[in-house]
Design a protein with these regions (language model features):
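A structural signal for multi-pass alpha-helical bundles of membrane permease subunits
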Residues: 3-229
């Protein structure tokens, strides 16, 4: 038994060495450097002064608040909207393959290109969006220049971009549901809404959990789209 344990341990050694070199050592080095002030020539140990200065920054609270609003709204809307789109795309429609391709298209475009395109579309005077709304709204809306609208404008673009991946995950989860559940429900006289909330939604929970995690993490670490816009 001891020989078998030693034999299996030797197989773990290469992975442990790689993990140590790639993760543990850089993490410890980063923590040490965070407590110093240096310019690649001279360095001085400062303890927790850098952390105190960071958390005493006035704009930190605003940044954290906006980041949480961004992550919660983008992930929440993606989770709900992508689910209903996936339900529609897995239904009995003739053009569902074409529509799935259209839904997935935003994921093929780079984030910077999307940001630049929507920045042009949201221009207060020359933008396509304001031109389309000119029939209903007389004043020009400054989508990205107004502090009250800028965050929500970028949130809308992020939702448009991220719906594709969320929908694909939902489609895969819904298609993996055993069809016998739906057949049994139809025999019992269940309608479409009852099957949706009693069968599809509960059994698609693993896919929903994946969408929630990926969308929320993506919202927290989003930078390129915000920078581009």
């Amino acid at each position: 038994m001891n020989k078998k344990k030693m034999y299996s341990t030797w197989f773990l050694v290469p992975a442990m060495i790689v993990f140590l070199l790639i993760f543990i050592i850089p993490t410890m080095a980063s923590f040490f450097f965070s407590m110093t002030v240096w310019d690649f020539k001279n360095w001085r140990f400062t303890g927790l002064d850098n952390f105190i200065m960071f958390f005493s920054e006035r704009s930190l609270n605003i940044g954290i608040k906006n980041t949480l609003i961004y992550a919660v709204l983008t992930s929440g809307i993606k989770v709900i909207l992508a689910f209903f789109i996936a339900v529609f795309l897995t239904g009995k429609i003739k053009t569902k393959n074409i529509q799935r391709s259209i839904i997935f298209f935003p994921n093929l475009v780079s984030t910077m290109a999307i940001g630049i395109t929507f920045t042009a579309m949201m221009h207060p005077t020359r933008g396509l969006i304001n031109r389309a709304l000119s029939t209903f709204v007389e004043s020009k809306i400054n989508w990205l220049g107004n502090p009250d609208l800028a965050l929500f404008s970028i949130i809308g673009v992020d939702i448009w971009k991220g719906l594709s991946i969320a929908t694909v995950i939902y489609v895969a989860g819904i298609q993996s549901i055993d069809r016998t559940y739906y057949e049994a429900a139809e025999i019992d006289g269940a309608n479409g809404r009852q099957k949706l909330f009693a069968i599809t939604a509960p059994l698609a929970r693993p896919a929903m959990n994946s969408v929630i995690i990926l969308s929320f993490i993506g919202g927290l670490r989003s930078f390129d789209l915000i920078w581009a816009m």
